[in-house]
From Swiss-Prot:
PANTHER family found in the cross-reference section: GRB2-ASSOCIATED-BINDING PROTEIN (PTHR45960), PROTEIN DAUGHTER OF SEVENLESS (PTHR45960:SF2)
Effect in UniProt of substituting residue 340 to F: Likely abolishes phosphorylation. Rescues fluid accumulation in clr-1 e1745ts mutant
Protein name, as recorded: Multisubstrate adapter protein soc-1
Effect of residue 124 to A: No rescue of fluid accumulation in clr-1 e1745ts mutant
Lineage: Eukaryota, Metazoa, Ecdysozoa, Nematoda, Chromadorea
Biased composition (Low complexity): 192-222
Organism of this sequence: Caenorhabditis elegans
Effect recorded for residue 31 to F: Likely abolishes phosphorylation. Almost complete rescue of fluid accumulation in clr-1 e1745ts mutant. No rescue of fluid accumulation in clr-1 e1745ts mutant
Gene Ontology biological process: dauer larval development
Gene this chain is encoded by: soc-1
Outcome when changing residue 408 to F: Likely abolishes phosphorylation. Weak rescue of fluid accumulation in clr-1 e1745ts mutant. No rescue of fluid accumulation in clr-1 e1745ts mutant
Post-translational changes noted in the entry: May be phosphorylated.
Annotated knockout phenotype: Causes a decrease in synaptic levels of lev-1, unc-38 and unc-49, a moderate resistance to paralysis induced by nicotine and levamisole and a mild increase in uncoordinated movements. In addition, forms ectopic muscle membrane extension during larval stage. Rescues fluid accumulation in clr-1 e1745ts mutant. Partially suppresses multi-vulva formation and partially restores fertility in let-60 1046gf mutant. Prevents constitutive dauer formation in daf-2 m577 mutant.
Region of interest: Disordered: 192-246, 275-303, 315-377
Amino acid sequence: MSIPDENIILEGSLKRCKKYKLFKTKWVEHYFVLHCRDRERNLFAIDEFKTSRKNDLKKRFKLEFVIRVESNLSVSDPSILCTAGGGHQEESMLNCIFGVGFRFENIVKDLYLVAKNDEEMTLWVNEICKLCKLHRQHDEGDSSHAAESSISGMSMSSQSLDMSIIEQQQYAENIPESKQYHRMHHFKSVISHNSLPSNPNYNNLPDPLESSRSETSSMYSSRRTEDDSVSYTSGPPVPPPRTRHTLNRFVKNGQVGRLHMIPASTSMGQVVKVEDAEDSSGETLKLDTPEQYPESVTSSEGFPVYERNGKTLIRRAPPPVDRSNKPKNLRGEEEAGTRYRNLSRNGVNENGNYSATFSSRTSNYQQSETSKRRNLDYFEPTQMIENSSLSTLAATSTRSPTPSDIEYISVDVDRTLAFKQMRRAAQSTD
């Protein structure tokens, strides 16, 4: 492809920065021609040839995509992503560098060229700027100021920002003290009405404005603790922490639990009337005088503690139960046990041998009856056992009461299971 001589504007040998390996570049000397490729539309281009014969076109750069032209660049400039491959000798020859930036859609690519001298570099830069209608950004100053990189521009913007801050501070110093105090006072009051202090030591923070501090601190009433002098905002009362000497625990199969987690036995003082005889056992609680206990001694946990028969009782036993209205089909084995007991009493008076034989049978029967009525076992209240090392609570159980004492007890299933586990734990420790 040959270019007519009338279309050629400028031509000559220039060195171009070219990438030939990964992360490696080198400067290659090619022949460049600046010409008009379309006079009707006034379009220009720079063609790159391998030699001055202009018979092998390497690449064409269209000037309608030019966005900027830079001159007087150096190899050490960070904007040039190309190094001198020949060391210091090659770097000394790369003095007259200029760059042309092209924009393709959203991508900007730079073409860096090296001229032989400053006059040739200036000629190329002026012709490209005239054809692309570009203007110089810096009309004053030397040529080295025009070659400053983007880093210097960032430093200038930061300097201007610092100057604006200094001017604001100087302006604030010139404000009269009365106006400045009024403005600070208004700012403090707005903060105190719209927001709460995030720091618990808000009232103790130093503040030069005593009046605003008094206004703000009057909104929050503070109290001081006995341990330290740190003030806190007032709020709901906090319950006192539990003291260490009242740690009441029980050990169950290697597990440690709290005593208050076990439901306490309730004592009912009123008669519970049965309305439906089919759904219930037909029993009522007797209105009897409660069993007399000695005066209670309030423990550290807040519940009464009684002493009876040399044992420390924490809770009182439930009232007796009336079984007069219980259906006959629910009595069953208990009546038979009563009949055998009556016979055993008579046998003691009449014949000693018979009573001994019958008493053994009765004891076996009572044991089988106890095993069948495990869901109705009655437990004594929890006793306090004091050891030399640690004061603990252990629940001990007794045998099932006879029907003459308490004929029938309705015990909650969950409560019974809890007491049974405590009994097994006590037996295993023994």
